[in-house]
């Protein structure tokens, strides 16, 4: 089979056996489906937008970038975030899946940051192979192994009194969150999604408990 990776426009896709889409933001995938209903297609490149591992506040002067999934556009925007990319392809059974750019951080192409940043931070893993938060998002929905991952870490000195968005990536049916000894809501996990709570930061501890079929199976 012949395939092609397209960043826009249908002309180059017409002779291909398998259409490859580089970024749903740049391609009219739904229109192509109507125009070429028999065309096989996949995501030949879709961004993760993962940012700097362990960083939850932008500091571009230090080369630090928050993951796009947690930016104001949100995970349901088409703008460069891992969650929307996976949802888009999972919701469309006529698409064969996707390749994420990238698996690892790499030297060069620091977009959207400038010097002193010298490398891309869009990897699912950092330069040393340590998983970023978004690796746990994918593991939640790509494996049957129970997953329960909390972010951010709770060592946020300097942000005392600030309202913090606490997220959980998990494939549990429900998750209950406790912040500094106070239980917050127990929430059902949406398919291919995440859960979030707001809490005012004070030093202490955050705990999550995951439930399957009404039974506690994980605690973090």
Model-derived segments and their meaning:
Residues 216-220:
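Extracellular and select intracellular beta-sandwich modules with Ser/Thr-enriched
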């Amino acid at each position: 089979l012949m395939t092609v990776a397209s960043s826009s426009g249908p002309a180059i896709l017409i002779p291909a056996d398998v259409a490859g889409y580089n970024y749903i933001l740049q391609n009219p995938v739904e229109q192509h489906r109507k125009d070429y209903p028999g065309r096989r297609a996949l995501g030949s490149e879709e961004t993760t937008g993962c940012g700097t591992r362990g960083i939850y506040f932008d500091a571009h002067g230090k080369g630090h970038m928050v993951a796009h999934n947690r930016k104001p556009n949100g995970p349901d925007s088409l703008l460069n975030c891992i969650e929307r990319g996976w949802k888009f392809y999972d919701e469309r059974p006529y698409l064969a899946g996707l390749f994420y750019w990238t698996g690892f951080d790499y030297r060069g192409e620091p977009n959207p940051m400038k010097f002193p940043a010298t490398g891309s931070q869009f990897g699912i893993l950092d330069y040393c192979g340590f998983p970023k938060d978004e690796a746990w998002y994918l593991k939640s929905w790509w494996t049957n192994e129970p997953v329960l991952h909390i972010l951010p870490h709770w060592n946020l000195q300097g942000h005392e009194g600030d309202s913090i968005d606490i997220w959980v990536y998990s494939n549990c049916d429900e998750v209950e969150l406790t912040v500094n000894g106070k239980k917050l809501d127990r929430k059902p996990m949406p398919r291919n999604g995440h859960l979030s709570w707001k809490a005012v930061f004070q030093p202490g501890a955050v705990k999550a408990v995951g439930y399957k079929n009404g039974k506690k199976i994980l605690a973090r």
